[in-house]
Structure formats: structure tokens, C-alpha cells
Amino acid sequence: MTFGAMLLHHRKSAGLSQEELSERSGVSVRAISDMERGRARSPQRRTTEALLDALGLDEQSREELRGLARKAPRHPVWSLPPYVADLVGRDAELTTITTTHDRLVVVHGAAGTGKTSLAVKAAHLLESRFPDGQLFIEVESDAPLERLLRDLGISAEHVPEDANGQTRLYRSLLAGKRLLLVLDGVSTEEEVRTLAADEPGCLTIVTSRRRLNACTRIRLGGLTEEAAVELLASIIGPQRVDADPQTARELVRLCGMSPLAVRIAGNRLASRPRWPVRHLVELIEERRLAALTAGDLDVRGAFEVSLAHLPETARLVFRRLGRLAGTRVTPELAAELAGIGVIEAQRALEDLADVGLLDADDAGYSLHGLVRAFADSLA
């Protein structure tokens, strides 16, 4: 039952007209009428308390009406950012997300692989399946649960101060909803448990550098060379790529086929239309990560964020990996390079693989391309 319907029920049970309730409470007749008709769905706390006092309700009825007053409006909520028009090479991953029957999808991978772009594009494609709304929350920002409550229509004065109260209110607001939620930049399983919309009609898409648990889990790596060249062409124009396709392929290989790095390279070329593609290739060969910055996009900065969230031992091991003669590393070799025990080294390598700073396979661990250049710069 809605707040308005319950208010109408209690007013009639008390034998009061709207005018009489207005006189007792100090709330205008028009406001009472709007609330009862559902045109004003989330009254201010002082308005609610004035009506409760005027109706003379018992404590249980007062709590029920207070709870309904905190309920979110029924119109759809929307806070998705625009999606990037040039998302390429991710058709299979988009299909996996848009056809899943699970309530939770985790998209994980190294910095710069396009996790957020994929999640946002999928959310836009799924809009018609979630009529109650689509929400986007940056989990690393302050008070993500409080922000969710605000996005769901709860006024600041109705948000409980304690975390347990916020969680209970959040769960009550999700009940019966068909809503899609994107949780961007999740670090821990606890954040997923607290924030995910775990209701039968809801879907939560999580992006994370870590391999978090989920029934549907998608690992993003680099693009194929063909897709990376397609992304470059969408930014600088196909004419410049077609003029020197071999150099364009060389450029995306230098970028490690990372969507972020290719986008930065493309932006640099787009803002310098007289530059031949070869010129940027030579810059990257000479300066490596220092050449891959454009505006607020920065490959090195993305790697630094990944590294900063790891334990000190993992950071130490990564710095020592810049001394490697090759690209592969074992726990024994990492232990020798860092001056630590093999078990500690194994744990550190797993931590690095978790955030995409190392590739892991049955043969061990390896680092390539731009990540290798980053490690070299720290050695």
C-alpha cells in the first residue's frame, strides 16, 4: 500500500474530512489531496509527523506510515552515463550480459580494458527489461549506499544515519522492483553483498579489477589487433588508417591492444591532424608510457591506481619484476628478486594477477607490453 492510500484509510477511519485534517495538522487541503491521490509521494518528515499527530495513531500505525513516507517514487530512476559510441570488439561479452538469467554479472580485468564502457553499453541495451530504472554508482566515491538511497528517491532527512538502517531501507525499496544497477570500481566481496540489487527482477553489473565471485563472470583483456585498428579508425578517421595500415597496426601493438591506450593514441592524433601515424609510433617507442597521455586519460595513472590498492609485498614484487630479462616469472624467481619467501611471492603474484598486472596460466605468470614498460620504469 502507498503512503497516500494509507493516509486516506486512516483519515476516513478517524471520520475526518480533508478540511478537518488540514485544520488539525496545519497541512494544506491541497497537499493532503495530492498525497492521497499519489501526486505527492514522498512528503517531508515534518509534514508526516504533523499528520500522524493529527490522526492520533498508535505507535505501530505511526511506524507503518513513516515507512511508507520514506518509500521512493514509482517513476523510473535513471543515472546511467552516456555510452561510448565506438565500443568495438566486445560483441560476445555484450551478448553474454544481455542474455543472462543471473542476478549478478562481474566484469573484471586490468586497468584500461574498457570494463565500465562495456557495462554501461549493456545497461543501455537492457533498458526495456528494467522499467523501474537503471542506476550507476561509482563505488569508490563517498557513501555509495547513501547515494543509492538518494537516487531511489529518499530525501536526505529520511536517510537513516546508521549503516544497518540504510541497508534495511535499501532492501525494502528494491522489493518487487525490476531495476538494473551498475556498480563501478568494486574492490571487495563485501561491497557486492551490501550494494547489489539481489531481487528476482533485478540485475547488477559489477566492474572490478579483481576476480570477484559471480555465476556470470567476464574477463576483459586486450582487443584483437583488428578491433584495435577499428577503434583507432573511429577516432582519427579511416582515411588516415588506410593511408598507412601497416603503421596503424604497429601503433596498436605498441599500445598493447589496450582500449584505453588506443583511445589515448587516437585522441593525440585527432588533435594533431598534420601528424603522420608514424610520428606517434616513434614517440611511443622513445617515451613509452609518457607518450600515452591525453587530457585526463593516462595509462600510467591507471596502472598506478591498480598497484596502490595492493599489499606492500605485491607492490615490492612488481617493482622487482622490472629486472626480469624475459617476460615470464615463477614464484621461485619472484622470491629471489624480492628477497622474500616463496609462499609470500606466490601470494604476491596472485594478487598482481587478480588486478590484471600479470597474466596467469598453467605455466606460471607473465607480463607484457605496457605493463612491462610500467614495471621497467619502477625497477
Predicted stretch roles:
Residues M1-H9, E23-V27, D34-M35, R41-V84, ...:
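Short amphipathic recognition helices of helix-turn-helix/homeodomain-type DNA-binding modules
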